[in-house]
């Protein structure tokens, strides 16, 4: 079976030199939470990654099309459209794309003093069900904002901004109800046509 870590058609990814990241760890607006690497992989057939000893960073994977799988702590899970996983540091794991319906994923590595505050109690896939308040596109716009800023991370102010945005991005998964609450109208009546239009935009 073919196994590929990265180098896919249409992929986008950004990383910064470890020496630069080490210097940023002294910055109070960065060292609590920051991106180490970030990317987007579209329909990545044969995608596979295994870490036999885990990593010193956490990783978020958000699947928006297709499906894949994820193995950790002796259990294997299917990861489908509108599901995400947060992989904790220090634990061996592996994951990969489904052969017949390979996933499209947005992913990032994150680190910092507050990293563990964003880890789940159980590292299993979580579903984000689309509805009229789902804000799926808002979340992807946040990702793109982080990606764009981090890609300019050689300039300290852009790195700081990417770290500030990272709080909001991670919170959009972990505090899903609160993230969606802003879309719930204060009026008692929410027009049916508005709900239909929003759903079509999200899907």
For each feature predicted by the language model, list its residue ranges.
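Short, charged, low-hydrophobicity "junction" segments
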Residues: 6-18, 115-120, 141-145
């Amino acid at each position: 079976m073919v196994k590929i870590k990265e180098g896919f058609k249409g992929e986008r990814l950004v990383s910064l030199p470890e020496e630069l990241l080490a210097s940023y760890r002294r910055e109070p607006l960065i060292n609590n939470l920051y991106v180490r690497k970030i990317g987007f992989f579209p329909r990545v057939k044969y995608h596979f990654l295994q870490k036999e000893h885990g990593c010193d960073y956490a990783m978020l994977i958000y699947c928006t099309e297709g499906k894949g799988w994820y193995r950790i702590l002796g259990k294997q899970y299917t990861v489908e459209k509108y599901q995400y996983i947060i992989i904790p540091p220090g634990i061996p794991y592996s994951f990969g794309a489904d052969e017949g319906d390979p996933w499209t994923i947005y992913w990032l590595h994150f680190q910092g003093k507050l990293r563990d505050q964003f880890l789940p109690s159980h590292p299993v896939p979580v579903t984000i069900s689309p509805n009229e308040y789902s804000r799926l596109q808002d979340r992807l716009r946040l990702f793109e904002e982080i990606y764009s800023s981090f890609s300019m991370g050689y300039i300290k102010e852009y790195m700081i901004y990417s770290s500030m945005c990272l709080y909001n991005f991670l919170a959009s998964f972990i505090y899903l109800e609160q993230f969606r609450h802003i879309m719930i109208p204060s009026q008692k009546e929410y027009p049916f046509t508005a709900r239909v239009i929003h759903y079509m935009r999200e899907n």
